[in-house]
Design a protein with these regions (language model features):
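C-terminal motif of bacterial Sec signal peptides marking the signal peptidase cleavage site
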Residues: 17-18
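Contiguous beta-strand segments within globular domains
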Residues: 26-33
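Structural motif
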Residues: 35-43
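Tryptophan-paired
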Residues: 53-108
Length: 168
């Protein structure tokens, strides 16, 4: 009696889980947003400069500059998260094979180098046999500090305290 119940249970599990078809979703974006964690200020940034440089050029060979970002995290309802979120209005596509300089309000600078990223397939949390193909940012160096970025592979998370204050 017990063996037939066990066999029935195995057949049921096989039929319900074996019927799913693998579903793949591909994101082509290099990253979705840049998070500056531990902002510790009520000041909301007004301006961002996102500059792409030739990799390992010591920030001397500019490829492109962009200031078209949406800035979030300033509202009182979001203040409990103590962060600012910068999302490009025009997304960057593909693996990141360049260095980045991020300048906030002409006063705070982040030099981002050695970005370790690759195209990878990860399981989607929404259900079985659902997969996401995306660019995973595993680690990066910000102003000389190596950061592990594996917990947020589609975003760039940076502690604000790593920013260099620009003297005028």
């Amino acid at each position: 009696m017990g063996i037939s119940r066990f066999s029935s249970l195995l057949v049921f599990i096989f039929l319900t889980t074996g019927c799913y078809i693998d579903k793949y979703t591909e994101y082509k974006e290099s990253f979705f947003s840049i998070y500056l964690k531990e902002w510790n200020s009520t000041i909301c940034p007004k301006k961002i400069a996102f500059e792409k440089y030739v990799k390992n050029s010591n920030f001397k060979e500019l490829i492109e500059s962009n200031s078209d970002f949406e800035i979030k995290g300033c509202e009182k309802t979001e203040s409990e998260f103590n962060q600012r979120i910068f999302t490009p209005n025009t997304f960057y596509i593909g693996e990141i094979n360049y260095d980045i300089k991020l300048i906030i309000d002409d006063s705070l600078e982040f030099k981002i180098t050695n970005i370790q990223n690759k195209l990878d397939t990860v399981a989607e949390k929404a259900g079985p046999k659902k997969w996401i193909i995306m660019n995973n940012i595993n680690s990066l160096i910000v102003n000389g500090y190596e950061l592990d970025n594996t917990k947020t592979p589609l975003n760039i998370w940076i502690p604000t305290k790593l920013g260099k204050i620009i003297r005028k």
